[in-house]
A protein has these predicted regions:
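Phosphate-backbone binding interfaces of nucleic-acid-interacting proteins
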Residues: 544-683
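Class II aminoacyl-tRNA synthetase-like tRNA-binding/catalytic domains
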Residues: 2-11, 16-317, 327, 406, ...
């Protein structure tokens, strides 16, 4: 039963009631799950369109009734008379329809009821009367629940309030919903549920459904555009022995039938180039790739990539194709080439700006790398500017780090960044005029890299030398280095024509064109950390088919601390006055994301009880993924001075427990009872 703090019945009780209703239907021989099909003649948007057209045909330009000079009763009578006349004309030639969908609203009024039915195209009101469908059917309808799926046959009419509706003559329960739908999604916890239970999200939020309909349209228009340029769509292997074509860590697995270790592809590149060698002059593939990396607002380990290759052109040709395609997508999908993302207008109709990487750094950082000749000079400059680098890094790597630090965040309007350093582009053709640079570009929009394109390297000798350097990088600890691919080198030795190639992140493109804030908002089922407990048994939280057991006690886990090593305690005392100046507070994690271009840092948005969000950065990404920390209650020191990290001010420090175990450092973020409110002070 409902308590004083909750007017809604207990969810488990509601589920039991629904189960009882289903049992009663089955006992009466009305099991909805025995129905195998239903004849749908129209979707809801079509019903509206055909009725409006029919109405215009029969009523023409009949003016609305003029009630000027009438008193309230006269006006009401006049309006009713006009409605009845219109209704009589329309009902004389009724349009019969049959549609189906999920019931999202129901209002029972004695012998008649209204309900809203949602299908793929929208919602439609249905008028259900006992006289029209019969006593038994109406009695069953009154017992129905929100979430049930119905088929409705009847004729279209317009209500007195002006809403186009369907007057039901026959209703059929097609599926009984045994789970209780939420009223709406809101807050952090529900955001997590939206991603985990996307099927519920699609039911409750029409704008989410619209996003994924638009995603499908975007991919369809990409294919239409490329088909118009005589490209051929192909499919290449997902499981590969050598995951090349990009700088990323692969997922690894074992192929039992062949007894071989294989990897999931991180790119589509090398197989598509083999097809260019084979004489397929224009090829593309849209497919899933997998990179064993972090999760944040713009990255998901499994994502959709589109790569295309065109023989007898170069990166200039790829720029023209990219600019034309983006313009085509904006116009066909959004209806305009001037789009808005997060309140910022982005003009895809104007010619895209073109800027070399060195010129961009010169413009935004005031450094001219064309005058810097050695790796040592570049490293010294990086130290001077406080840019972190690894000892193995070359001048080319430092140039890239400078670009990421100073330039990316400035690139809002479409900009081609061209002519990258050779060191970071192992599959790209050198510029004839400057062998330290390559014919490569990246398109940046809204600070994001939208695509990456090359004049493809087709010299097998040069390619072998670059693979050798990548192998050395791997030996020196570069986990993202590519490895020598002998079969690909053999393909190049057969002969590959001059070729332009490009890769597009489809998910990021969809984010841009749908104004979606995070990559998870454009992935139907994004990667999520598994929940403890029930989900580990392949269940979803509290399912209707099997009610959860309550108050089940589990035996405490026995922990072996015999191999644990901790730092010695401090010998120096701290007086109470000094200690009391440290402000320890409970904080709630509102958001948590990986910091771009950092493998260690997580950025926390915290509720510290003041009403103003607090940002704290913590180098714990090796131990936690961002999504598992959202909603947790942590402990922070809040009165430390702000400290800039990766260009972000970190205002405080989160407390963690650190120890060593078998030579490996272990870390546990200090999490406390969620009943502790944000801002509670620790003593």
């Amino acid at each position: 039963m409902a308590d004083k703090n909750n007017s809604q019945p207990d969810v488990n009780e509601q589920i039991k009631v629904r189960m009882d209703k289903l049992a009663a239907l089955q006992e009466a021989g009305k099991d909805p799950f025995q129905i195998t099909k239903y004849d749908v003649t129209h979707h809801t948007d079509e019903i509206r369109a055909i009725y409006e057209a029919h109405e215009k045909e029969l009523l023409g330009d009949r003016p609305a009734v003029n009630t000027d000079g009438m008193d309230e009763q006269q006006a009401r009578e006049s309006v009713n008379a006009d409605y009845n006349e219109r209704r009589a004309i329309m009902d004389a030639s009724p349009i019969e329809v049959s549609f189906a969908g999920r019931m999202m609203f129901k209002r029972v009024m004695g012998k008649a009821s209204f309900c809203n039915i949602a299908d793929l195209k929208g919602r439609m009101q249905a008028y259900i009367s006992r006289d029209a469908i019969g006593d038994d059917a109406y009695a069953d309808f009154k017992k129905s629940d929100i979430g049930d799926i119905f088929g409705i046959k009847g004729f279209i009419f317009r209500t007195k309030t002006g809403e186009i509706s369907v007057h039901a003559e026959e209703i059929t329960l097609l599926s009984k919903s045994l789970q209780v739908l939420p009223e709406k999604f809101h807050g952090i916890t529900d955001t997590d549920m939206r991603y985990r239970q996307r099927y519920v999200d699609l039911i409750m939020n029409p704008e989410v459904k619209d996003t994924f309909v638009k995603r499908s349209q975007i991919i369809k228009e990409i294919r239409r555009f490329l088909d118009g340029r005589d490209f051929m769509e192909v499919e290449t292997p997902t499981l590969v022995s050598n995951a090349g074509g990009a700088a990323a860590r692969p997922f690894e697995t074992h192929y039992n039938a062949l007894d071989e270790d294989v990897k999931l592809r991180i790119s589509l590149e090398l197989y598509l180039k083999r097809l260019i060698v084979g004489g397929l002059e224009r090829v593309y593939e849209i497919g899933r790739v997998y990179r064993n990396e972090g999760v944040d607002t713009r990255h998901n380990p499994e994502f959709t990539l589109m790569e295309l290759y065109q023989a007898y052109t170069d990166y200039e040709g790829m720029m023209e194709l990219t600019e034309s395609m983006f313009r085509h997508l904006a116009q066909t999908v959004c209806g305009t080439t001037e789009i808005t993302y997060n309140g910022t207008k982005i003009d895809l109709g104007k010619p895209f700006r073109r800027l070399t990487m060195n010129d961009a750094i010169k413009e935004y950082a005031g450094v001219d790398f064309d005058t810097i000749k050695t790796d040592e000079e570049a490293k010294a400059l990086a130290k001077e500017r406080g840019i972190e680098f690894e000892e193995r890094h070359t001048k080319g790597d430092i140039i890239n780090l400078f670009f990421e630090e100073y330039c990316e965040e400035k690139l809002i309007q479409p900009t081609f960044i061209m002519d990258h350093p050779l060191a970071i582009s192992p599959l790209t053709k050198k510029k004839p005029s400057d062998p330290e640079k390559v014919e490569r570009f990246e398109l940046f929009i809204n600070t994001w890299e939208m695509c990456n394109a090359y004049s493809e390297l087709n010299d097998p000798i040069d390619q072998r030398e670059r693979f050798a350097q990548q192998d050395k990088n791997a030996e020196n600890g570069d986990e993202e280095a590519q490895h020598t691919d002998e079969d690909f080198l053999n393909a190049l030795a057969v002969g590959m024509p001059p070729t332009g190639g490009i890769g597009y992140g489809i998910d990021r493109l969809v984010m841009l064109l749908t104004d979606s804030p995070a990559i998870r908002d454009v992935l139907l089922f994004p990667t999520m950390k598994s929940l403890d407990g029930v989900n580990k048994k392949n269940d979803v939280n509290n399912t209707a088919s099997e009610a959860p057991e309550k108050n089940v006690k589990t035996e405490s886990e026995k922990i072996d601390f015999s191999k644990v090593k901790v730092e010695p305690l401090f010998e120096e005392d701290v007086d109470f006055d000094t200690f009391s100046k440290s402000d320890f507070r409970a904080v709630k994690v509102k958001e948590c994301v990986a910091v771009p271009k950092s493998k260690k840092l997580l950025q926390f948005t915290l509720d510290d009880g003041t009403g103003t969000d607090r940002t704290i950065l913590s180098g714990i990404h090796a131990y936690y993924e961002p999504e598992e920390l959202v909603g947790k209650t942590l402990i922070a020191i809040t009165n430390l001075p702000p400290r800039a990290m990766m260009g972000i001010d970190s205002c405080g420090m989160l407390l963690s427990a650190v120890h060593e175990e078998e030579g490996e450092e272990k870390l546990h973020l200090l999490m406390v009872d969620d009943h502790i409110p944000a801002g509670a002070k620790l003593y």
